[in-house]
């Protein structure tokens, strides 16, 4: 029997991916204050630190626990800047104006914590957006509801704005499943054992 998996995230996309792969889990959202981690120019180091701190925060809420705690963090990186979730609609509009007709990176780092042993892994995918007309940006944000998405777009509802996706689409959604598989293998756990 596999160890219980605790998802330390309220992300609907991460939940969806685990459900899609029939991985049973419980949710204990991390209440970690992300502003405690400052960005120093390295998107991978930044997201790994955030994922790690979220895992530690969940372990404090759910201790002691003979379980696997899984957390993650996703950002968009372009031209030396990072884009997280927009603060408001005006911020979302500005993000899409910056990212349109460009190729940018989507970086997701995940952390797996078990009995004090922390493992982190990252994946980067490239996304190219189309030249979204100014008069379509606001309607896209309103229709799709992208204020909860880093970069202010949703790859699952990107039909008219996505030109190209290079890399793992699960990474873009917030949970690179192969990275999770490799991290669990380092703990001698096979992700296949979780699938029903």
UniProtKB/Swiss-Prot annotation:
Root EC class: hydrolase
Cofactor: a divalent metal cation
GO MF annotation list: nucleoside triphosphate diphosphatase activity
Cell compartment(s), UniProt: Cytoplasm
Disulfide bridge positions per record: none
Residues of the active site: 73 (proton acceptor)
Gene Ontology biological process: nucleotide metabolic process
Pfam families from the UniProt entry: Maf (PF02545)
Keyword Cytoplasm attributed: yes
Membrane-traversing stretches: none
Purpose: Nucleoside triphosphate pyrophosphatase. May have a dual role in cell division arrest and in preventing the incorporation of modified nucleotides into cellular nucleic acids.
Entry similarity comment: Belongs to the Maf family.
PANTHER family: BIFUNCTIONAL DTTP/UTP PYROPHOSPHATASE/METHYLTRANSFERASE PROTEIN-RELATED (PTHR43213), BIFUNCTIONAL DTTP_UTP PYROPHOSPHATASE_METHYLTRANSFERASE PROTEIN-RELATED (PTHR43213:SF5)
Protein's name in the database: Nucleoside triphosphate pyrophosphatase
Organism name: Chlamydia pneumoniae (Chlamydophila pneumoniae)
């Amino acid at each position: 029997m596999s160890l219980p998996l605790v998802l330390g995230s309220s992300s609907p996309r991460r939940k969806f991916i685990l459900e899609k792969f029939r991985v049973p889990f419980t949710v204990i959202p991390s209440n970690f204050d992300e502003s405690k981690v400052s960005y120093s120019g390295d998107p991978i180091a930044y997201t790994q630190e955030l994922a790690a701190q979220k895992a530690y925060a969940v372990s404090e809420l759910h201790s002691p626990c003979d379980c696997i705690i899984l957390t993650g963090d996703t950002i968009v990186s372009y031209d030396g800047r990072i884009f997280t979730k927009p603060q408001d609609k005006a911020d979302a509009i500005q993000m899409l104006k910056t990212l349109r007709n460009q190729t940018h990176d989507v970086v997701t780092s995940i952390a797996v914590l078990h009995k004090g042993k922390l493992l982190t892994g990252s994946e980067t995918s490239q996304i190219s957006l189309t030249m979204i007309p100014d008069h379509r940006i606001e309607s896209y944000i309103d229709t799709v509801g992208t204020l909860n998405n880093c970069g202010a777009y949703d790859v699952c509802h990107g039909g008219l704005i996505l030109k190209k996706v290079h890399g793992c689409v699960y990474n873009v959604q917030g949970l690179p499943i192969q990275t999770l598989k490799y991290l669990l293998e380092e703990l001698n756990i096979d992700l296949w054992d979780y699938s029903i």
